[in-house]
Structures are given as structure tokens and as C-alpha cells.
Amino acid sequence: MNSTAKLPKIILASTSPFRKALLQKLRLPFITENPAIDETPYPHESVVDMVNRLSLAKAHAVAEKHPNAIIIASDQSATYQGQAVGKPHTYPNAVQQLNQFSGETIHFNTGLVVFDNRTQKTYQTLDVTKVTFRTLSETDIHNYLILEEPYQCAGSFKSEGLGITLFSKIEGKDPNALIGLPLIDLTSFLKQCDIQLPFL
């Protein structure tokens, strides 16, 4: 393909500015749409199962309105010692989270679904990224929270911003997955949908 006229409509099923910015790296024309699904976890559902289910549900919700489009959807959840990590919402809760994570490792599970509504084919994967925090002082934590205010972010940090200063190590296949969209796997899936990348 060498013309946008030949490209199918590509829709990112997300309102996240971070996912939008990541997808823009691929230099493909796309639009965004809010999947507007219920993201409540099921009773006794594992984090991995939830992430996979929600990624698929987001894709299908948007696909219903766009019969010939390619839908990209993602969901992410972090775990610490096997338990889901929530959003702190307040400064005291964020301090508590970061104190708990000091010197420890948390896992980010990022689900990705590409649904080709032309063929009804689904491409799905789960990326796991391990983030190890350095030993954090009270000053480290206070200064970071005042500067970045990550109170709506699971784990009380923004890895795409100043949060990177809190880490000693990141282990994973794709650094973009930690921010919310695994671009390496996404590129592979789009190629299977006959989208040439790099696209000119």
C-alpha cells in the first residue's frame, strides 16, 4: 500500500492521550473513539484474564459501529506481589504506595487487541513488563509527587515522565508497553492486516 486512499479506517479504541501519542509514532492516519465499556472486574477474575477480556471488549464495542475498520484496543493493570495496584487518588495514598514499592518490583500487564472488521480476524497478545524501583527516600517521594501529581495513575507514577527517575531497572520486550501500547506487537498485527509499515 502506498496511498492513504487504499488504507482501511484505523480506529484507536481509547481516549488516552498517552496511547494516542504512542500510535502517532507509527505515522498512520487514525481516529480515536471512546469504547465506553464497563471495566468492573469480575469476581475472582485474575488480573491477566481481566486485561485480556477488557482489551477484547473495547475492540468489539467500537467495531460494532465501524464495519470495515481495523480497531486497536488495549488495557493495562499493574500487580505487586500478585495483587492489583490501584490509583492512589490522593497524596497520602501515593506516598504509601511509593514507600511500599521502594526497592521492590511490580509487573505491568498490557493487553493488546487488533480486530480487523473486514475479515473478522482477531489478533491478541499480552505484554508483561517488570519495573524495579530504586530505594526511595521520603524526599524523593515528596518531590516527585509534588512535581508530577500522578494521583490518577496506577502505582503513583508516570513512566513517560519524571517517574522514570524512580526506577532502577525495566525489563520487558517493548518500552512502549509500559506507557500503554505495545508497538512492536502492534506493528506485527497490522502487517498481518496488510498494512505496510513503515507506511509511505
UniProtKB/Swiss-Prot annotation:
Keywords, ordered alphabetically: Cytoplasm, Hydrolase, Nucleotide metabolism
EC annotation from Swiss-Prot or TrEMBL: 3.6.1.-
InterPro entries reported for this sequence: ITPase-like_fam, Maf-like
Protein name: 7-methyl-GTP pyrophosphatase
An individual GO BP term: nucleotide metabolic process
Required co-factors: a divalent metal cation
Keyword Protein transport attached: no
Family classification: Belongs to the Maf family. YceF subfamily.
Keyword Cytoplasm: yes
Marked site (Important for substrate specificity) residue numbers: F18, Q76, E160
Residues annotated as the enzyme's active site: D75 (proton acceptor)
Functional summary from the UniProt entry: Nucleoside triphosphate pyrophosphatase that hydrolyzes 7-methyl-GTP (m(7)GTP). May have a dual role in cell division arrest and in preventing the incorporation of modified nucleotides into cellular nucleic acids.
Broadest EC class assigned to this enzyme: hydrolase
One term under GO cellular component: cytoplasm
Signal peptide positions (record): none
Lineage: Bacteria, Pseudomonadati, Pseudomonadota, Gammaproteobacteria, Thiotrichales
Broad class of the protein's primary localization: cytoplasm
Pfam families recorded: Maf
Catalytic reaction(s) noted: N(7)-methyl-GTP + H2O = N(7)-methyl-GMP + diphosphate + H(+)
Source domain of life: Bacteria
Alphabetized GO MF terms: nucleoside triphosphate diphosphatase activity
Cellular localisation: Cytoplasm
